[in-house]
Amino acid sequence: MFSSILTKVFGSRNDRTLKKLNKITEQVNQLEAQYEALSDEQLKAKTGEFQKRLQDGEDTDNLLPEAFAVVREASKRVFSMRHFDVQMLGGQVLHTGQIAEMRTGEGKTLTSTLPAYLNALSGKGVHVITVNDYLASRDAEGSRPLFEFLGLSVGCNIPGMNHAQKKEAYAADITYGTNNEFGFDYLRDNMAFSPGDRVQRELHYAIIDEVDSILIDEARTPLIISGQAEDSSELYRKINAIIPQLEQQEKEDEEGKNGDGDYTIDEKGKQVHLTEKGQIHVEEILKTSGILGEDESLFAAANISLLHHVNAALRAHKLFSRDVDYIVKGDDVVIVDEHTGRTMEGRRWSEGLHQAVEAKEGVNIQNENQTLASITFQNYFRLYDKLAGMTGTADTEAFEFQSIYGLDTVVIPTNKPMVRKDKADLIYLTAQEKYEAIVEDIKDCVKRGQPTLVGTVSIENSELISNILKKAKIPHKVLNAKFHEQEADIVAQAGKPGAVTIATNMAGRGTDIVLGGNWQVAVDGINDPKPGTVEKIKEQWQKDHDAVIEAGGLHIIGTERHESRRIDNQLRGRSGRQGDAGSSRFYLSLDDALMRIFASEKMGNMMKRLGMERGEAIEHPWVTRAIENAQRKVEGRNFDMRKQLLEFDDVANDQRKVIYEQRNELLDEGDIYSTIEAIRIDVVDSIISQYIPPQSLSEMWNVSGLEEHFKSEFLLDIPLQKWIDEDDKLYEEKIRERILEEVNNAYKAKEDIVGPDVLRQFEKAVMLQNLDSHWKEHLAAMDHLRQGIHLRGYAQKNPKQEYKRESFELFTEMLEALKVEVVTVLSKVQVKAESDVEAVEEQRRQADEQPKQYEHETASATQAPEQAPEAAPAARPGNALRDGPKVGRNDPCPCGSGLKYKQCHGKLS
């Protein structure tokens, strides 16, 4: 109560922010008349003037009013469009590195031109990031005339571009592109083998369109570049045949995994688990089919991959549905993005899930992949010096934006008042009754000439409603991932009188539905349109527009609630743009996934007790509150999962930064001799310590072992025993110096053969190749560690702390192994001429040209499965290696003193 009184007196934080921004908007408005009087040349010259002032040390904040006024005036001349004051507010929010919530139709694309121009003046580049290729190309081409008028270059970064095109796109002052492509380019740059192979500049400033979709919906799906691993397609087919023989356990008992069924399904967590009976049953089937030996156990360390295949097949059959999570296109399984409803061509699920789905659908099974590089959107976008975003629905997720990205959300007022009518939800007992009511609503709209957009949560549901409408003989269009090529045409005409459009979440986000249809699209479809034809099209559009307004504007029908209130608001937001008339209503049933999983059984029992007749709907605030509570539960759970993923990925991210930083330093350095020399000294010293422990007696030295090691690993004959025999005062420190001198002399001899330049080039190639190889193996080890880390909780240990500790140990071991590998390769290789260096480069190029997959790891794969692969025990460096049989603690000491080993030299060890 006290806080509400304070808000009334002082205004909300949002009100206070807007008040400050309005003062700057006034300054921009005061400059309008002055800039209107400038000629085109004088207006264009302002860009050079601003750049000079920035170079002289002036701050971009000081330039803001003038720069915004210049963009507004240029837009009036190039597009005949003037930025509204609310767009000026949005532009300021974006410039200050915050999120601007702007309703649909308020001109977010035009708003972004303001901060993009201002921040591009520094010459460091601005990235404008959208959710798909179509919007990236459209916005780049749409904004190009404005920016080029002002003397700035525009690039577009989309998939399929060659290296030169990408380089050119990133060199532009303002680069448009998709979030996926920017992320993958970052990973590819950090796999490059020469500085010229990299395409991205430093990450300076990014404006993210539909920021909620990218930073929240896709936050749990890491970007992964992977290479092909071994072929195990036949095993996937065999395991796939087992799944139909298993039965689901309907209800878990108190113990959780005992009962009559073979597996349980957790719809909330999107997980499937074998019961104890199921584990025994699967083992029996595997033995009968000859996959598992009679005396073998499914849970033996050697068979852990079999269990992995069984779990993947179970998930493929029981959790992933055709036309909901994926579609089958020819001989390929194509993922459907759960948040946008779009297909994700070329993307594959990780951990064998994609292969399991391919086996289930009977299509060609592609090889498994091994991760070469990965990053989450959360960590990629936090690399930018300044980050901003815009969307129509951010306020419900404001806490997450602030806590994870440090981004405040500012709600920008609409240019015209919102007049859309959001009607109360109607809840039915069954899905069939719900669909019957939806059809009646659509019929009523068609009769009155009101356009209707029907929103569904999956391709399957969109096709189900389409079939119902076909039976009712109602003409309609379907917009889902199967027909995404027609998206622009369908959305353009979705506002025509009586038009019915069924759409998944993709719903043409980024494209406005114009009431009466889009006359510009109709004109563009005519070859060489005559002025008279264009006028007729405009006249017809005006009649249609007026008729639609009279009928009530665009009517939105939601066929079920989404997991997030924000997605519901996005659907509603398709209607009521720029003060247009419109309405919306959601139709629900107790069969809907959200109601079934999260709404309590009490609601269903209450509705049944009310004695509701067939086809009768309930409208009650109590029910609406229960639905909103269910959505809040899901939002809270999803936030916790994203936060947990970030906490785990932050550990890997710190390591990724170290590796990529070292890698880039290697690429940029012409001569890495000093680095190689330091590594060589370190490795040689470590090897000597294994055989001649520091500060040890000569009786503890393993001389023959050390000689053999250098012979096998360095191809170097070191007569250590001879040195010792010749000099009885040859102490450990002197031995180290002489061995290192021998190693250095041998290396110098190689340099004399080929010359220093060739050897430096060879050193860099070997270093990069081994760094990438060890990093790849380290990523696999980290994946295995994360899958099983939850088991540490059973030992009363904190899984996150254990993950940090063990991942650090893995990282340290990886760096040590890398050093040894590099020194060993350089010592063993017989370099004869420059052609040897070219051979290594050619080998590297061939490896680099191997087909790679660009994947989104499935969100559910980020949760730890029940059984984690066992890690192979790692050899611990630094232990002295024995020469000869092991000496027991109570055996006579081999030095000949007559004492027991534990009382003599055993004390020292």
UniProtKB/Swiss-Prot annotation:
Enzyme Commission (EC) number: 7.4.2.8
Gene Ontology, cellular component aspect: cell envelope Sec protein transport complex; cytosol; plasma membrane
SMART domains registered for this protein in UniProt: SecA_DEAD (SM00957), SecA_PP_bind (SM00958)
The entry's keywords: ATP-binding, Cell inner membrane, Cell membrane, Cytoplasm, Membrane, Metal-binding, Nucleotide-binding, Protein transport, Translocase, Translocation, Transport, Zinc
Required cofactor(s): Zn(2+)
HAMAP family: SecA
Protein name in the entry: Protein translocase subunit SecA
Organism: Pseudoalteromonas atlantica (strain T6c / ATCC BAA-1087)
